[in-house]
Each structure stands twice: as C-alpha cells, then as structure tokens.
C-alpha cells in the first residue's frame, strides 16, 4: 500500500480514541489556566542511555542504567500531587527502559497525560500496540534527514518502515520533528513532505548553539524553513510554533518564560531543572519541590528567553502571557559537558 493510501485510512483509525483523550487534555488545560500554580508539562528522564550517538545531542550516553521503576513511580506520584497535566517520558531513548509500558500505565492511572519522545528505531508493531493500550496520548519521533550522516542517524531511509507501522497501528497522536541544520535544507523539506503524506504533523525545530540560542540560517535555509512552515498539516497541531518565524525575522521574541513552573525537566537523579537546554539551573529534588518553588520560578524572568528556540518552553508559557513577572532574574549558570550533565543540588 502506498503512503498516500495508508494515510487515507490511518487518520480514521487514529481518531477513534483521540476525541476522549483530547477532552481530558482540554479539561486539564482549563483547570491549569485558572491556577498558575499547576505545572502544564514535566519532562521525565527515564534513562540516559541511547542506541544512537547524534552529533548535536548532549543528553545521552551508552552506559547508564534505566531509572528504577519504583523511583519513576514515586516521581510520577509527586507530579500528580503538584497537579501536572502532561508528563513527557524522555532520555536518552525511552524505549530502552524495560518497564516503559508500566511507567506509561502509572502516568495514566494517576490522571496525568502521558507522552514520549523517541528516535523510533526500536518501534515494532507489538510495541506500538502496547504503547496504545497503556494509554499513551502522544509520541514525538525525531527525523532529521533522508540518510544518516555524521550529525544525525535519525533518518527517513531506515525509519520509513517504522513510520508506516505508526500510520497503520498507532491510536495515539504522532508528531515528527526535524532539527533544522542536521542535514541540507532540501533534505529537511523532503522529510517534512514524506511525513505529511502519511498524515502526521511535520514540525521543524531550530538547531541551538551551546548557550541554547538558535543557530542563524542563510537565505536558502530560510526559504526552505518557510516552505515547511506552510505545509497544510502544520495548522492541525495542538500547539503552534509560529514564534520561530518571529525569532528568525527579528532575532528575538518578547515573551514571559515560565520555566521551572509551567514546565520543567526531572533528570535521572530526580532533580528538577528549569528546562533541558539549561540543565543545572534550579536543580532541586522533586520530592522537595513545592508551591513556593513553582511560584518563584513563575515570577522570575529568564535572561535567555528572548532568543530561546525551544518549542515546549513557548507553548508551556502561553496561558500566562498576560501575567506579570515581578521578580528580578537571579539564575545560576548551567554546568554541563557534552554527553553528561553535572548537577549542583539546591535545597
């Protein structure tokens, strides 16, 4: 069956269970909109180990053991106590965790909305069905180029079969993200078109320098980026990423970042960090992270915000664009080296 024919069938299959899930999400978002103390999304690292070694990634290693199931369940319980809406399981490669399905079940059982990031290599028909049965709401698959190169191994050629399996069997939402700059611009456009042909949301994120700011694009890359932005299915995504066009045009975006409050990252050691690109900022045990921490982070401007290209940061802050940030910025610097994260615990 061709990709186009598969896409004509798959959306009907995916919609069957999505309406109820979408309604649950909308109820959670509505509750969070009136309660600024509630986190919208937490990125929960389940393992640092990854089966790939992409040149731009500093969030993995090849040796770390998975976070124990009991520890993950305790962290999920704490996120539920805080009223978190989304929990995104990430790594490393989450599919390397032997108890991933049970982790997803626990997220769902606690009334939270489970999502996950993956490079897709370990997906099988059986795993996709198991993820669906466990209650997974959304999956983001990284796909950067047509064929593997020195920068990224997340490529359409080896993953095309995995995409077709997702189109045929996934009842959860699927979004495919391309890091713009991991391959020639024409390849990014070809990937986006191939993904859209299968009925998935095709998104493109800007590559970042070590400080977290976006790398500049030349005229050719800007033109291709605009073509990807104009793909019809970009308008169907749950969260818009239109801030990227403004960032490319003006070099900055004026917004109020709610890192550490509306969204944050929980590392393998159970510490809360403002966000993944700024690991080390605000590192504090999740078990001790409470309303005062959320409120302080909510009210604190972030000096890196104007040039931030991180989509979930902007998305997680949109509910509160009108709410003030009266505190001065007083963030400690991040401490990290490629491939490993060095943490300073704040109590």
What annotation goes with each model-predicted range?
Residues 2-138, 329-330, 335-340, 347:
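Conserved alpha-helical substructure of the radical SAM core
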């Amino acid at each position: 069956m061709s990709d186009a024919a598969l896409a004509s069938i798959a959306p009907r299959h995916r919609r069957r269970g999505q309406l109820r899930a979408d309604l649950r999400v909308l109820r959670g978002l509505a509750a969070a909109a009136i309660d600024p103390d509630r986190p919208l999304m937490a990125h929960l690292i389940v393992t640092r180990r990854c089966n790939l070694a992409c040149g731009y990634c500093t969030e993995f290693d090849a040796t770390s053991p998975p976070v124990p199931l009991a520890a993950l369940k305790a962290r999920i319980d704490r996120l539920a106590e805080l009223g978190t809406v989304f929990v995104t399981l990430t790594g490393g490669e989450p599919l390397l965790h032997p108890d991933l399905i049970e982790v997803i079940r626990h997220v769902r059982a606690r009334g939270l909305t489970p999502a996950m990031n993956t490079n897709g290599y370990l997906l099988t028909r059986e795993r996709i069905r198991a993820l669906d049965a466990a209650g997974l709401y959304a999956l983001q698959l990284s796909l950067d180029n047509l064929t593997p190169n020195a920068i990224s191994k997340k490529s359409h050629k080896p993953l095309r079969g995995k995409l077709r399996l997702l189109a045929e069997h996934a009842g959860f939402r699927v979004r495919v993200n391309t890091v713009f700059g991991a391959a020639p611009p024409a390849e990014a456009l070809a990937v986006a078109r191939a993904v859209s042909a299968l009925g998935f949301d095709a998104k493109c994120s800007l590559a970042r320098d070590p400080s977290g700011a976006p790398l500049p694009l030349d005229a050719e890359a800007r033109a291709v980026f605009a073509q990807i932005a104009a793909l019809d299915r970009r308008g169907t995504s749950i969260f818009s990423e239109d801030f990227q066009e403004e960032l490319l045009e003006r070099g900055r975006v004026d917004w109020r970042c709610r890192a550490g409050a509306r969204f944050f990252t929980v590392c393998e050691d159970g510490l809360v960090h403002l966000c993944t690109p700024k690991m080390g900022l605000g590192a504090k045990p999740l078990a001790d992270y409470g309303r005062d921490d959320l409120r302080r982070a909510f009210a604190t401007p972030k000096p890196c915000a104007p040039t931030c290209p991180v989509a979930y940061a902007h998305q997680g802050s949109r509910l509160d664009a009108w709410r003030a940030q009266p505190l001065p910025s007083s963030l400690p610097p991040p401490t990290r080296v490629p491939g490993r994260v060095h943490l300073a615990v704040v109590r």
